[in-house]
């Protein structure tokens, strides 16, 4: 819903880059490297890339510039107004400037041969392989791609829980449009395969807890296949699906009760509260959350039935009586 009036004048955009972004501790404390490294992170919104960021920074001894367009949104001088005017849709109004700052920060960091951690969705494998990765390699960077394998019901919960928790804690959250979430989720496996075909960089896949599940240097599978299999495997773990079902129930409760507790949101006033309820209804958030709850409940119940049948089959080795799950 952004329009041209939301985009900063060129001079102000560049001033903020010089005076705020390029003077941040993350940038100025990172030193030039003889053999700089770039770790490109991929995953749909809510997948849990934050854990991979921390892991990558630790591997690089905290000596790296982290590039995350979402973190750069806060530098927009009108961001507080946007959050008040559009509690759900404000991030779109900062998108153009934040994306440009991310590109400009990358250019500045690579010019000084600083290590990079690039937090992205990796939804465009062609651009990533032919422009981003190739450009970094031409500048002497050792490049690696790391992706998070998170099933859609998990990442969707991550997006929604982040929004509600931050709204309760600080008065605002960052929502990601449903269409964007759906598109990115579907594109990631294809993007990984495109990168694998068009470049020689290692591709590694991790789960949300940071455990490595795949390394293209040692696994004959295509990364897209490995990602899909890892996503699906997560939903076959009954302990995981039970936990996710309980987590989604909390989200259902939050959205159902929003009209009753909206006045408790910090740093808000009646105008902001009314706008939050208006956008919440317009985007049919409660319906979306309810559908996710229904999805994980079905998977969780099926998983329980499979476990029951498996136990029965095992017992049948000793006794022939087994009651099918009702």
What residues fall within each predicted segment?
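Conserved GTP-binding G-domain of TRAFAC-class P-loop NTPases and closely related GTPase folds
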Residues: 155-295, 300
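Conserved phosphate-donor/acceptor-positioning beta-strand/loop module used by diverse small-molecule
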Residues: 137-159
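Conserved lysine of the Walker
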Residues: 49
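Hydrophobic positions on the alpha1 helix immediately C-terminal to the Walker A/P-loop
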Residues: 52
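Conserved nucleotide-sensing/catalytic segment adjacent to the nucleotide-binding pocket
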Residues: 61-137
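Walker A (P-loop) phosphate-binding loop of P-loop NTPases
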Residues: 45-46
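Non-Sec secretion/translocation targeting segments of pathogen effectors
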Residues: 1-3, 296, 301-326
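N-terminal pre-Walker A segment at the start of P-loop NTPase domains
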Residues: 1-30
